[in-house]
Amino acid sequence: MHVEFPVDEKSLRYIETMEDDPDIKAVISILLDKRKEDFYNYASIVCFCYREQDLMNLPDVRHIPDKVKAWIKRKSFDQDPAYFTFFKHLFSLYSGFVQTYEGWDKLGKYRSVIPESYVYHRMREKYASRPEVKVERECFVVIDEWDSRTHRAKAEGQKVDVGVWDDIAQRGEVYEVKVKVYIKQKEHQLKFLEIIRKLSNKKVNVFLASFAPKNVVLQHLKAFFPGRDLSQINIMGVDELRNL
């Protein structure tokens, strides 16, 4: 089977420009440096805080888990350098946008780069010693004669956030990555993942990944798409990502 993930160079340059923002770069660097519980806590702050006011009143942010709030309090009391660097850059990023719905929408585009970059760099790290494994981002999908650029309209979605293919093992993975899963009007993204899995005869595992807990992701999906079969898509929440 022939599988490849041609990169959308224009889209990649756009993402990399946002990734070069000093605040984004610092936040991603800290997330990549953390594992397990620390990663869970840092990622949860990114997930559940979407405006400057949230960062100014972390104990009052309703959806942040209590154990994360306790961790924040401890890190603040200990004056942990990594935590203060993370918070400084995250606050700088958030406060750089007008605190209106329009500003939060623009900020959301920058926030969305954070989990996508995390997954991409984790995959690059995982397969660094295996040159036969190709890891791409902002990429189209080609499976034998099927090409997402010609077989799907732009409105349906033609790209995945991250694509991985091992030509020797004939196995791969694709990831659609979100900060939180709010795709009420984007069922086509789920269908795209299912099509990839089907056309590859299940040789490409498909993932919907988020910084939100898996149970929250599933609650959202079931609320948005009642009765929809979700069994073809692997759901990864913050717990799964911290062990990626």
Language model features by range: what are they?
Residues 1-244:
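Intrinsically disordered, low-complexity Ser/Thr/Pro/Gly-rich regulatory segments
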